[in-house]
Swiss-Prot record:
PANTHER family: L-SERYL-TRNA(SEC) SELENIUM TRANSFERASE (PTHR32328:SF0). Keywords: Pyridoxal phosphate. Belongs to the UPF0425 family. One of its GO terms (molecular function) is L-seryl-tRNA(Sec) selenium transferase activity. It comes from Methanosphaera stadtmanae (strain ATCC 43021 / DSM 3091 / JCM 11832 / MCB-3). This is UPF0425 pyridoxal phosphate-dependent protein Msp_0916. Coiled coil: none annotated.
Length: 383
């Protein structure tokens, strides 16, 4: 038997489990290790200002100051999601019939980039090898992903080589720094994308920081104003409540937690090796790719006639249901990576010990084996 993963129903099931956990045991019972938990730390005084015009008037200057400190550049543009910023950027800067070229450490790119390229009638090419990377005369935008969805980081040298090639062709460079604005800088001590020479940088205010799901874009005043026009035309701007949450997240952000997780990850990794598991390390924890989860389940005796993305999602769903541990495959947006990633920098990691996490990881593999043997996939994923 084989099934195709229904992304909408899968996410609805994951969120229902979370809702039931909150109603039964409270929100503090959840252990969100996605690195995307975010936060919305606003005060009664903030709430009194959350009106259509009063809010932007009061908070604009503050988000500009904090955003520039975090990302660099001359001007900041808050948007309702990083994806929104990418969409607006491409609509504003890319003409039909031209090309977007993209360099990243490992494919695939965030789907919003190729999808919007198609939307505006532009060609799109991805490169992971700098020796093959090329910018022809028809290129209107160069993208760089600073840190991939699985937290793989490109070097400063590669950054500079791509930017140099783009500048030689007089092509605008945009950096998708969704989590990279924290990982690259806190762990690898890299400069901001703007300081490296990029024209635009966009980051997610919920990734490895305690802000709400939203996006912050930085760049020159001229370029940001051009993109801002599109953002306002399409209703992609961050409203006052979101901007306040972003400000609080930026104020609370400190690289120390990320740096501490980076130091501890090797101890955590060794505990997993001691259990005969072989995850991949990330800068702030560890992860199992979907194929690795399938292989581990098969190693434990299950005969798996099912695609790896389904197995990984089952594993993620069982983690929530049995251990209250949230990972991306069960609850991420449609199209999100099915890598099961455990972020030890997440604030909820304080709720359990390393040994408790390792025990949950191992037991969930056994539970996934039972699902495979009993052919309970649809029940776990959707019912």
């Amino acid at each position: 038997m084989s099934i195709t993963l229904n992304e909408v129903k899968r996410r609805e099931k994951g969120l229902k489990i979370i809702k039931d956990k909150i109603e039964t045991d409270g929100i503090d019972s959840l252990i969100d290790l996605t690195g995307l938990a975010g936060g919305f730390d606003i005060t009664p005084e903030d709430i009194s200002l959350l009106e259509t015009y009063a809010g932007p008037a009061v908070y604009e200057q503050k988000v500009q100051k904090l955003g520039i400190k975090h990302l660099g550049g001359e001007k900041i543009l808050p948007v309702n999601r990083t994806t929104s910023g990418i969409v607006a950027m491409i609509i504003a800067l890319v003409k039909p019939g031209t090309k977007i070229v993209h360099f990243l450490a490992k494919k695939p790119a965030h789907p919003s980039i190729p999808r919007t390229a198609k939307l505006v009638g532009a060609d799109y090419e991805e490169y992971t090898n700098l020796d093959e990377f090329k910018i022809d005369d028809n290129t209107s935008l160069v993208f760089i992903t600073g840190t991939t969805m699985d937290l793989e980081v490109i070097s400063v040298e590669d950054f500079k080589r791509v930017i140099k090639q783009a500048k030689e062709k007089d092509v605008i460079v945009a950096v998708d720094d969704a989590s990279g604005a924290r990982i690259r800088r806190a762990v690898y001590n890299q400069p901001t994308a703007i300081d490296l020479g990029a024209d635009i940088s966009v980051t997610s205010t919920d990734k490895l920081m305690e802000g709400p799901r939203g996006g912050l874009m930085a760049g020159s005043t001229e370029i940001i104003d051009k993109i801002k026009l599109v953002v306002n035309q399409y209703g992609l701007e961050a409203q006052a409540p979101l901007i306040v949450g972003m400000i609080k997240g930026l104020e609370k952000y400190s690289p120390e937690r990320i740096q501490e997780a980076f130091k501890q990850k090797d101890e955590l990794y060794q505990k997993l090796l001691d259990k005969q598991l072989n995850p991949q390390t990330t800068p702030t924890g560890f992860m199992f790719k979907e194929e690795e989860i399938k292989a581990e389940v098969e190693k434990r005796g299950a005969k798996v006639d099912m695609d790896a993305d389904v197995i990984a999602t089952v594993y993620s769903m069982l983690l929530i249901d049995n251990y209250n541990i949230i990972t991306i495959p069960a609850v991420g947006m449609p199209g999100a990576s099915k890598t099961v990633r455990f972020d030890w920098a997440a604030k909820d990691s304080d709720k359990l010990t390393m040994d408790e996490l390792v025990s949950a990881v191992c037991d969930t593999f056994d539970k996934t084996v039972e699902v495979c043997k009993n052919n309970d996939f649809e029940s776990v994923l959707y019912n």
